[in-house]
Every structure is written in C-alpha cells, then in structure tokens.
C-alpha cells in the first residue's frame, strides 16, 4: 500500500513539475486529475496507465506512465512505421505484393481472409493492420522485417529504448501480469507516437501516410475517441488481449489547437476478464478536460 502511495505521489509531483512557473491553482488542477485517474482505476478494479503530451508546450499528464503494460495490437504502429521507414529508400516497397495462403490465417483476419490464394501489397497489409487490426497482416509485416526483434531494433533507432516486441500474432496478446514480453510504458509509447506522427522519425511522405492510416482506423470509436468532443480529429490504434487488457494510443487534433498525444493502457487480474473500453474513454475525458 505504501509503495502505491509513494508512486502516486511521485506521479503527481511529475505532473506539477511542468507547472513550476505557473500558479498554485494550476498545480492543484493537476493533482485533481491524478485523483480522478486514481478513482477511475480503483472503481475499474484493474491497473491503468496514462500518458498525455500537449505538443503546444510539451507539458505531460502521467499516471503509472513508467510501468510496463502489454501493448497488444498497439504494437502494430511500430511495425508499420518500420516498413514505412524502409520505403524511404526502397522505392515501390509499398506496392510489392505478398502471397496470402490459407495457412497464414490465424485468429483475426478481416481483410487478409478476403485475399486467400491471392496477394496483398505491403501498403494494403499496413492499412489492414492499422485500420482493422488484422493479425495476419501484422505477421506478414513482421516476417518481411525479419522478426519481432527487428521491430524492436527499429524502435531503438527512433530513440525508444523501452519498446520490446518478442512474439508474433496472436501470442503477443497473452498480457500475463508481470511478463515483460511485448510490453512498453505509456510514456515511452506516447513519445514514440509523437516522433512518428508529428516529428522527424519518418520522412514527410511516410509520416503523412501513417497519419492518414491512423485517422482511418475503424476500431476506436468506443475508446479514447468516445471521451473527446466530437469536433476533435483522432487518429488511433487500439489493442486488446488476455486479462481484459484494453489499449488505445492516439494523436488528437483539438479544434484550432496544437495536437495532443494520448496513450491509455488498461489491464486486469483475471485471465478472461472483459475488455473495458469505457475505462479508456473515461481516462481520455479526465485528462483532456479543460483543453
């Protein structure tokens, strides 16, 4: 209990560091956000991790942001980004075709299953992985890159020393408590997502393509997006796995303001616990209130 209290106090302090030159009411507001996230976590019965970066002034709102969580399908962003990076020097890569065999299909293949005994381009595989969370598409991208460790290696090249991908679909979604495989921290993922979509980790064309794919996601309406004003533009990637693990990572464009980058990770203690997208929506609502 004391360890949890100390951790929360540290996180509250972190939230206020960026407000050192601001007024006491602003720091009190940051503490209020921490208290609301703690209350949400307690009522949910799980473990919640949140990292919000306001790109207007680089302030951060953090909750368990340095703890590891299973990424599940949010890892697809890094795999797709690695392929996009290759396409900067391998012209025509996204148009190259890959055979889709019946044996390639696994547990969730909404797009790939339509192309069995046919082919898909790397561009189509990337879109399927990001916008429909197609697991066969993800495995094809990982195989092309040379294995999960190559995705991790790419993360290192963009300054992310925390991300680790150890397995392929669907086993990367086991999300066993305490298992470091296929995990990252909310803050590390938020920083990586910012670098990929708003920074210089990718070339202009590749960055624009990644953002377009994320904005076209079909799986996120009930997660982060559900906690935001309808006028805000969202590009996101969801993920889910064992132990009721429910994730969403997003770049958010509030109307008339600088983008926000938000990562929400949530997991539970029971292996067959239900997903809780409502928790992610509530967390998004809490941390963006007042923007």
Swiss-Prot record:
One of its GO terms (cellular component) is extracellular region. Belongs to the class-A beta-lactamase family. Keywords: Antibiotic resistance, Hydrolase, Plasmid, Secreted, Signal. The gene is bla. A beta-lactam binds at residues 76, 133, 169, 240. It comes from Escherichia coli. One of its GO terms (molecular function) is beta-lactamase activity. This is Beta-lactamase CTX-M-25. It is found in: Secreted. InterPro entries: Beta-lactam/transpept-like, Beta-lactam_cat, Beta-lactam_class-A, Beta-lactam_class-A_AS. It catalyses: a beta-lactam + H2O = a substituted beta-amino acid. Coiled coil: none annotated. The active site is at 73 (nucleophile). Monomer. It is an enzyme of class 3 (hydrolase). Residues 1-30 form the signal peptide. SUPFAM superfamilies: beta-lactamase/transpeptidase-like (SSF56601). GO terms for biological process: beta-lactam antibiotic catabolic process; response to antibiotic. It holds the Pfam family Beta-lactamase2. The keyword 4Fe-4S does not apply.
